[in-house]
Amino acid sequence: MFNFKSSDKDAVMHLEIYTPEDKSNLKGMIQICHGMTEYMGRYDKVAQYFTSKGYVVCGIDIIGHGHSLQNGSRKAYLGKKGSWEYVVKDVHTCYTEMKKRYPKLPYYIVGFSMGSFIVRDMLLSPHLRTKIDGCFLIGTGSQP
């Protein structure tokens, strides 16, 4: 577990990191970006499966979700108008933090539902430098 200040300068983001027991032969990293009303804890079994195969798995509870839910804030509330950009930047901060820790590992990202829109925005943003080796968009739509 790792916490960092959100790009909104208010929320504290909760980054969950799952690592294989045997760290001698790591195959890659998988970042999960969850959907609306979810949190990283819902992906524990998925993370356990991939760590058993040699992958480091990570993801944040986005603003208004899971451990990133602030006292008194509403569940699934992303913030005031314009907050979408903060959410995208926070997911990118997770990417940046994990690349610092494991710079040589291949990097894959999975976005589910709303998380797929976040991932698409992050990858298409010209000001966020993101280099990944694979992307899985699950339950996405045609327009974010």
Question: Locations of the language-model features?
Answer:
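Alpha/beta-hydrolase fold active-site loops
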Residues: 27-31, 106
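Alpha/beta-hydrolase active-site loop
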Residues: 79-99
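Active-site glycine-rich loops that stabilize anionic/oxyanionic intermediates
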Residues: 34-38
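Alpha/beta-hydrolase-fold enzymes
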Residues: 118-144
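N-terminal cap/lid segment of alpha/beta-hydrolase-fold proteins
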Residues: 1-22
